[in-house]
Design a protein with these regions (language model features):
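Long, contiguous N-terminal structural blocks used for assembly/anchoring
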Residues: 1-113
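Acidic, proline/glycine-rich low-complexity IDRs
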Residues: 2-29, 122-178
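Compact soluble domain cores
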Residues: 91-141
Length: 178
């Protein structure tokens, strides 16, 4: 049985310029903002934490989380602009729900300083915030992927735009979850 000292001896340091973070190999990472200083939740599946190259990729992607969030927002805007885009209907539904279906008081809270009824769906994308960033193994692809949750305001709505990135920092899937 592992003692506390054994666990402390087995701690690994995440290779990140952004945060000073230690983790235990083979244990899931799930942290809140107050634990890391990051402005979002951070999580990594346990099967990745004992793989140094996978964790190096986590550190690199974590250092670029906001840049990747901007890339995700650009992809959402592109999907909104092109009715033939694969995710057009999905992202349109997400935007329509938050502007037209939540009620005017909630919409006003989601989009402060605006008249939500006059906002275009593309303008709404700029209000999305990074809520969570993590990494897991996609069993269909049999590879490590990165997952990002974007939300208008997690204290008001639990609806998310979930963006999946591959190891090359390319988006391969956009979903809507709650």
């Amino acid at each position: 049985m592992l003692t506390l000292q054994d666990k402390e001896d087995s701690l690994m340091k995440l290779n990140s310029k952004r945060i000073d973070f230690e983790y235990t190999p083979s244990e899931e990472i799930f942290t809140f903002s107050e634990d890391t200083g990051l402005p979002f939740l951070f999580d990594v599946d346990e099967e990745l934490t004992d793989n140094p190259s996978a964790m190096d990729a986590v550190g690199e992607m974590l250092d670029e989380a906001e840049t990747l969030a901007e890339k995700a927002k650009a992809a959402i805007k592109a999907a909104l602009s092109d009715q033939g885009a694969p995710y057009h209907d999905l992202v349109t539904f997400f935007m329509q729900f938050h502007r037209d279906d939540v009620g005017s008081d909630i919409a006003a809270d989601l989009f402060p300083g605006t008249d939500p009824a006059k906002l275009s769906f593309i303008e709404m994308v700029d209000f999305l915030r990074l809520k969570r960033f993590g990494s897991l193994v996609d069993y269909k692809m049999d590879q490590q992927v990165f997952i990002m949750d974007l939300s208008f305001n997690p204290e008001i709505t639990d609806e998310l735009m979930v963006i999946y990135f591959d190891l090359k920092k390319e988006i391969f899937c956009i979903t809507h979850e709650s």
